[in-house]
Amino acid sequence: MRRNFIALGLIIALLAAGGCTRRGTNCADPGGTIKIGVYGDLSGQTSSFGQSTKNGTQMAADEINARGGINGRQVQLIHEDDQGEPGKAATVVAKLINQDGVRALIGEVASSNSIAAAPNAQEAKVPMITPSSTNVKVTQIGDYIFRVCFIDPFQGEVMAKFAANTLKAKRAAILFDSNSDYSKGLTRFFQESFIALGGQIVSEQAYAQRDRDFSGQLTQIRSASPDVIYVPGYYQEVGVIAKQAKQLGINAPLMGGDGWDAPQLWDLGGEALNGNYISNHYSVDDPSPAIQKFVADYKAKYNGVAPDAIAALAYDAMMVLGDSITRAGGTECAQLRDAIAATKDFKGVTGVISLNAERNAVKPAVVLELRNRKFLYKETIQPGGIAPAASPAASASPSANTNAPANTNAPSNMNAPANTNARPAGNTNAMGANTSGRNSNMSSTNMNR
């Protein structure tokens, strides 16, 4: 028996050593097709988010491959369904790294799932870019974790400013998901910002994900007579909340974040959603030629479906990754990590993307009004303040970027040989155009899904 334990111990030690060797070997670029793992919810409660992520990343990868790939190498996306569950997200990311041998990861949308999966990427030194997880904790997990979206402190501040300055609200109620890192984070930052602007929180009510009866919480909120109601949840509950609020005679506008942005929201909430507001990453109505080309191409590829913000962010995440691989000269772990971290002034469809020292994107937000099954542009809020306009300012066409190659819809110089002896430089040659500008002096604390 003792010998068996010794033998078992030796086997475990050898396997551990072999695992470390394999992980170390994996840091070297294996050449050939570049495998990228994409994970998201394709069959669970937030499957709309996962499908948009899959569509956006695949569209970007197809465009890259059609132009000859990255330095002559094709890109292969391997999609995994995490069913919207944190534990499953961690499992599929481990599978993508250890079995599929992916060189980088894109995902997730929900912050709780990214927080669960990111430690596996960090430990393996596989760079991970989340398109749309806005909770501040995500990128704090380690230096291989990045995002191309703004973060929750900024998003909460955006709607507090809109409520106080544009809607002239003095009294706000909050209805949040007590099981969601995203919802709890937005609640905190909206509350802090609204109070700092002179507002009062008159009621704060909680619900649990998958709840379908919100009448008790809404009755409490109605009795507090708020001017606005902040509901920082996901679309599958928000649509039901909006309908029940109208049934109870509540006329105060509801406000939320990017978690509302899904086609299914309208099926759940219908006309009860009219006159409510959300913060989001871009507007599909922006007249920028680059954005309108993206929208038209997406509709052509996906049977007339318009790209929501999740799809646009996923597209940008893949394009940022492609550009970073080009500048890194390949997919060696540390070189690719450094190239992503050096991303600067990348002109994506959701705005100009520059990553700060915390690996968060510094960029503005837009406020959209819900009306007749559409998200209508209201105003842009910069990190430094509000920049209202009747409609989004048209961005320069891609050809106006004098630093870019003739085809500015691709990551810069995809087919050119990279200087592998140089530290990756910040990118200024990326696709698209700035949808609403940015403040390069924005504090990293004013930014979070």
Task: Tell what function each PLM region has.
Residues M1-K35, G385-R449:
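Short, low-complexity disordered leader/linker segments with a strong preference
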Residues T21-D29, S48-T53, E63, R67-T139, ...:
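Beta-alpha junction/loop-to-helix N-cap segments that form part of ligand/metal-binding clefts
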Residues A89, V148-R171, K184-L186, D213-S215, ...:
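Hydrophobic alpha-helical segments within soluble ligand-binding/sensing domains
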Residues K301-A312, G322-Y377:
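Segments of small-molecule ligand-sensing domains
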Residues A242-Y315, E369-A389, A393, S399, ...:
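Extracellular/periplasmic periplasmic-binding protein-like sensory domains
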Residues A121, T187-S279, A389, A393:
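Extracellular/periplasmic bilobed ligand-binding domains
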Residues I145-A206, V228, L321:
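An alpha-beta-alpha
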